[in-house]
Amino acid sequence: MRSWLHLGLLFLALPLLAQSNAGELRLKVTGPDGLPIKASVELSSDALQFHRSFSTDDSGQLIARNLSFGLYRLQVQRESFSPHDGLIEIHSALPTEYVVKLSIAALSTAVNVTADATLLDPERTTTINHLDSKAIADRPASLPGRSLPDLVNSQPGWLYEGNAVLHPRGSEYQTQFVVDGIPLTDNRSPSLGPEIEADDVDSLTIYTAGIPAEYGRKMGGVIEVNTLRDARADGVLHGDVVLSGGSFDTAGAFVRVQDTFGRNTVGASASGNMTARYLNPVVPENYTNRGTIGDFSLSYDRDITPTDRLTLSVRHELSRFEIPNEQLQQFPQLQSPPGTTRQLQTRDNFETMGLASYQHIFSPNVLVNLRGMVRDNSNDLNSNNGAWPIAAFLHNEFKEGYFNAAVSIHHGRHEWKAGVESDNLFLHENFSDIVTASLTPDQNGACYPFDCATPPSFSFLGSRPDLEQSAFVQDLVHLGKWTVNAGLRWDHYQLVVNQNAVSPRFSVARHFPAASLIVHASYDRVFQTPSFENILLASSPDVTVLNANVLRLPVQPSHGNYFEFGATKSFHDRFRFDANYFRRYVDNYADDDQILSTAASFPIAFRKAIIYGAEGKVDLPHWNRFSGFLSYSYIVGNAWFPVTGGLFIGDDAVNGATQLTGHFPDSQDQRNTVRARIRYQLMSRLWFAAGSEYGSGLPFDFTGTYAQALAEYGQQVVDRINFADGRISPTFSFDLSAGAELYKKETRSLRLQADVENLNNRLNILNFAGLFSGNAIAPPRSYFLRLAATF
């Protein structure tokens, strides 16, 4: 532990930093005589679904931080003074200083603009989905471990596979979460990565195209997660308490507090959740699926001077859960030969991270940020003596040291940003298995489900560093009605292979004010590093003992070209329509596979993939009492043989070595996805909402027989699988929600929300991947309550 502290202090001493297209507003409110005024401030943007209430301090000042680039409506009010109502732009990382001079009400009238003026951001060069604190607070209920992924999955272009694994525009394991400016590139699904609770998140910004050059390595989609909250001007202790519960013995609690004294702000949060349906079960009966999760965080923020700011935080997260059984694992007497003990496999994940950032403003046009992180992550898989057909044990961990540095420069029409980053992961893998199925040949000379020559036991222990460095430069240029965002990024990756790459990025937008229209186009050259989950095992020569036929190829990084063309239009100053067409070309296309039908997976790669599609979304921020959205996604994805990386055993090895041509559907090739949610504000303190989701079904590749599938998963599941077409039957769910504000006084409130999900109680199969692993069934009809108090 001491060595990690030394390493963390070293990072803080280095000239490094980073990311996020966000700025800062420094507001001062005065009276007609120039003296400061304590006033109420409303800041909002319909384009960003953003609405915040602030108040200036006794000196008339207010600092609003972490504001995503965009156009905002600023409203300032104080009794006896005429209110101010105007627009303000945030398009620079440099603080925007703004002075509002209020006039005596009897002598002046307000400057009026309509809120609809913020429905479009004329300088946005790509479609970016943004979710703010209100959308997060009023979200539909989620099972533990999924509150954050569910929010992301509600956006166009994103799909769930089993167990809330996010797939942006057909990409496998290429999702990157950027938490308070620090990128997390490992798998953050409930089965592998402890969750940051959505109640602890202030805002989300989601990219699938036009991705800034400061982001790299995992490029299917980038999710900026902001957990930092502005301090209250009155310095009063404040926070939130949330209690929730519902179907599947689900219960949870969350608490967050924050206090400000002088130039210091201290915050803390904690949460705990439990459920009897943690993962997506493989059969409708939901066998062995209990899970508990928890997290705890502390943060400290100090404004050292008006130009220097220090932020420190530490977070600890954990999850413990069971692996769902299918029929033969739950009822060992049905196995061949019959068993006596029911299978129980468990997993646990633990993570502790410390983050530090420092900001210095050299001048009104130059700002430097430094950020660093140290992280310790471990995940385990254990099996009892009833595990079938294999008992697997896994004890993996990694330690990570990350730092970055960036400088932001405002010069005329240009917003320059340049930086460097280094990420060093020290991987440790410990895997072992014991085959519990019979390895004795039957009367036909065959064994099931493994080859008769499979070793009855196997173990692997390995360690290796994953070293990655990068540098970038980007420029946001304002040219009247045109906006250009151009960047260049260099990456170096060293693990199983050693590679460098240079990636240009370019996006452009044109605003047509008379038509309330923005058209945009983007090109992203991407360099994507493989998932490091069990990559040392898959790359080791030790695996050659598993079968007479083993194909072992080093997993190369993916190289790709992303194109997007789109438009955004405002209609009647009430709702906004976004439409995009995208096309992705990727070499060494990343995918994954399981180790001998266990719950442990590893990366593989195919020669190339071509993925294209279209997305559309209608956003209705507010119209009378209504608000909501409707989105549609169309995607076609194909991957091409041969395999170019990974581990292949038995028949898979033979096929991998001989199948050199042809293509097949990408695992996320769901042609049609529709999502909708509409909310009606019945009265000021009571609202109702309805939502639905339709998916045309994912493809699957099943190597077993119909009889085997029936024995493993039962008739209900098999009836939802189209074996002839190789696709899962369409999914559909209809949801209802209602919310009431039970109490409201000044900054204190008490809210109650009720949700009914999958009201139609349809058996929705999310994924069907083969024998003993990969199936995923969505929840049946379920009910949830959430009580939230703010003080």
Go through the PLM ranges and name each one:
Residues 82, 86-101, 107-212, 217, ...:
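Periplasmic N-terminal accessory/gating domains of Gram-negative outer-membrane beta-barrel systems
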Residues 478-483, 581-585, 604-703:
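Gram-negative outer-membrane beta-barrel transporters
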Residues 369-373, 379-380, 511, 554-605, ...:
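Membrane-embedded beta-barrel scaffold of Gram-negative outer-membrane proteins
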Residues 259-349, 379-383, 588:
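Periplasmic-side early beta-strands and strand-to-turn transitions of outer-membrane beta-barrels
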Residues 685, 693-714, 728-733, 739-791:
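C-terminal beta-signal and adjacent terminal beta-strands/loops
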